[in-house]
Amino acid sequence: MRVVIQRVNKAQVTIDNEVVGKIKRGFLLLVGLREGDELDQVKKAASKIAKMRIFEDENGKTNLSLKDVNGEILSVSQFTLLANTKKGNRPSFVEAMRPPKSKELWEDFNQELENKDFHVETGEFGADMQVSLENDGPFTIVLDI
């Protein structure tokens, strides 16, 4: 499982000119599931993200968690995070988990975050989406579980 965590001031997902998910300050999560991933990886990733301290405190140190700043989450499924570009010029996606299992685990991941009392907005699994955001920093972390 790979999650790209972007600290944002705001973010939204649009499909066919309709906003389907929108947050203010928080995390934009781009979520890629790998063949072989199970609920254990999903739970571990959600727990790690919930505790991650990447917001600045009053002294300018990255010491505050998402909960500390009353942040929100926008979760977007993105299988292309698992692209293999070692050979040739065309990415291979054989490592990416296929639906319907990937959709189920992504939904489980979002539910795990909601169970930790976060407001979670989402994109639409498998849809062609436009994601817009205002990075804060920028501060981006790649989490591999």
Curated annotation (Swiss-Prot):
Catalytic activity: glycyl-tRNA(Ala) + H2O = tRNA(Ala) + glycine + H(+); a D-aminoacyl-tRNA + H2O = a tRNA + a D-alpha-amino acid + H(+)
EC number: 3.1.1.96
InterPro entries per the UniProt record, alphabetical: Daa-tRNA_deacyls_DTD (IPR003732), DTD-like_sf (IPR023509)
Principal location: cytoplasm
Annotated function: An aminoacyl-tRNA editing enzyme that deacylates mischarged D-aminoacyl-tRNAs. Also deacylates mischarged glycyl-tRNA(Ala), protecting cells against glycine mischarging by AlaRS. Acts via tRNA-based rather than protein-based catalysis; rejects L-amino acids rather than detecting D-amino acids in the active site. By recycling D-aminoacyl-tRNA to D-amino acids and free tRNA molecules, this enzyme counteracts the toxicity associated with the formation of D-aminoacyl-tRNA entities in vivo and helps enforce protein L-homochirality.
Localization annotation: Cytoplasm
Motif (Gly-cisPro motif, important for rejection of L-amino acids): 137-138
Taxonomic source organism: Lactobacillus gasseri (strain ATCC 33323 / DSM 20243 / BCRC 14619 / CIP 102991 / JCM 1131 / KCTC 3163 / NCIMB 11718 / NCTC 13722 / AM63)
Gene Ontology CC terms: cytoplasm
Domain remarks: A Gly-cisPro motif from one monomer fits into the active site of the other monomer to allow specific chiral rejection of L-amino acids.
GO molecular function annotation: D-tyrosyl-tRNA(Tyr) deacylase activity; Gly-tRNA(Ala) deacylase activity; Ser(Gly)-tRNA(Ala) hydrolase activity; tRNA binding
CDD domains, sorted: Dtyr_deacylase
Signal peptide: none
This protein's record includes keyword Cytoplasm: yes
Protein known as: D-aminoacyl-tRNA deacylase
Pfam families: Tyr_Deacylase
This protein's encoding gene: dtd
Subunit: Homodimer.
EC class (word): hydrolase
Keywords assigned by UniProt, alphabetized: Cytoplasm, Hydrolase, RNA-binding, tRNA-binding
GO biological process, one term: D-amino acid catabolic process
PANTHER family, per database record: D-AMINOACYL-TRNA DEACYLASE 1 (PTHR10472:SF5), D-TYROSYL-TRNA TYR DEACYLASE (PTHR10472)
